[in-house]
Amino acid sequence: MSVAAMTMDDQRPLMNSYDKMSTAKYEQNINLISSGASSGISAGGVGGGGVPPSGPASPTPSGSEESHHHPHHPHHSHHHQHHTPNQEQQRQQLQQQEQQHAAVAEAVAAAEQRQRLLEDEIETLKLEQVRMGQICADAQRREKILMRRLANKEQEFQDYVSQIAEYKAQQAPTALALRTALLDPAVNLLFERLKKELKATKTKLEETQNELSAWKFTPDSNTGKRLMAKCRLLYQENEELGKMTSNGRLAKLETELAMQKSFSEEVKKSQSELDDFLQELDEDVEGMQSTILFLQQELKTTRDRIQTLEKDNAQLKQAHTKDDTVAMAPPTTNGTNKMSPPQTPTPSTIGKLEPIDENVALESKAAHPDYLNGDTRSVNNNEQILPSSVPGEHILPDDVNNSNSNGNGNGNAARLARKRNYEEETTTNMVTPTPTPVSYSVEEMTTVREVSTPRILPPKKSKLRGMPTRRSSQLEEELHAAATVAATVATPLILDNSATGMVSEEATAVAQPTLASVESGAVCPESTEAGVVAGPARISTRRRSVRMQQNGAGPLDYST
């Protein structure tokens, strides 16, 4: 079977075997094949019955195999015995040729495979060579770069070395610098101190060495033994004394600690009590301050009222003196008892004329008993207070329009002095007493100022419980109580100078709008819408308490 007639499956094991075969073995196989072919040819030509060597892949069977394969045909052999030797020779020759051709084909195929392998190896080697060349070029380039860097580093190193040398040369002290350092007083002082310390240490060292040499003794000496025994005894005594002192000190310290603890507890208690007391004192002080503030405000209001009353009294005295001078002049009439009409009072005169002193009014009545000229209508006109819907209306007598127009100025002035009308408020309850000698009725337009204390926290344990502060609600209650008391007492709106003594002191203090009752006996209360006088009850109550204390009575209780 030739190589061309073999399939690819048959050729693949041969190719694998030749790929694995080495070059020396391949040449050895070729030599064996050539030698076997030559020996087979020579044997076939001489003997004609030799068995040629079979190749590794010869598919044709040999002569012996054919004899074994056909034992059951004996009838063919004795029919063709005369043709057998020639045919066997030809067959052997053909087999040898085929074997030679197969060997040659195998050798050619192996050579071709080897050539292909070598070509592939050459290509790979070329590629490897190119790659190695590139690697070598890169390595050379890196080497050059590193060499350049190394040169730069060496240059920098040399520069640094030269700089260090220069710095050392600069820092090296010269002889002149050393001399100046030695001449420096601070350095000299330092050297002197070092010398003194060195001398002192040397002397101490010598002393200690001398003492050590003096105290040295041998172990067998009696002096050393006695000294050691004495030292042990002293050491034991020292330990015992230390224990005793430590125990005694501990007990003492424990007692002192207990005493300090008890003292600290007492101090804490006293401090807490002191804090409570201080808090109470603060509350009491706040209450006192509020009370003082309220009293100061009341004092201020009373002083203001006193000043205004003094001014009013001075004005009234001046007006009274003028009236006396006018009244002393003889009145002129037209032959009748009718008086000339008085002039209408101006607002300026009305504002200036206010309550008149009682003594001055009495003196004027005693000096001039006939100053009314026998006309009782003027008394009624002065005593009666007509109700008016408009507050501050000027009330004039009925005979203003019917009076004689021929009266002179002196008569008008006298009449004006005797029949002066004042500004009054509207009243609902009108009290008309029996006709008495009239006094000048003057009404003072005063306003009751109510001062309320600031609201503060009530003290816990205040000692000022007898003097609590007043609030607006308490003031209203006191005013209401004073109004009820004043309503029970029939106080006329127009009082005569002689009737003022019939009113009790407390009722007049409640009913009067001002403090004029303290200074004079004339009382001219202010009329309200209800006909009840609403005076400053707080001030009157305090005045009553002051009078009661002066008379021997107890203080007034403000707590109700």
From Swiss-Prot:
Compositionally biased region (Basic residues): 69-83
Paired cysteines (S-S): none
Composition-biased stretches (Polar residues): 331-349, 375-387, 547-560
Region (Disordered): 35-107, 316-352, 371-413, 541-560
Compartmental location: Nucleus
Bias (Gly residues): 42-52
GO biological process terms held by the UniProt record: cell differentiation; mRNA modification; mRNA processing; regulation of alternative mRNA splicing, via spliceosome; RNA splicing, via transesterification reactions; sex differentiation
Subunit architecture: Component of the WMM complex, a N6-methyltransferase complex composed of a catalytic subcomplex, named MAC, and of an associated subcomplex, named MACOM. The MAC subcomplex is composed of Ime4/Mettl3 and Mettl14. The MACOM subcomplex is composed of fl(2)d, Flacc/Xio, Hakai, vir, and, in some cases of nito. Interacts with vir and msk. Part of a complex containing fl(2)d, Sxl and vir.
Protein's UniProt name: Pre-mRNA-splicing regulator female-lethal(2)D
Organism this protein belongs to: Drosophila pseudoobscura pseudoobscura
Gene: fl(2)d
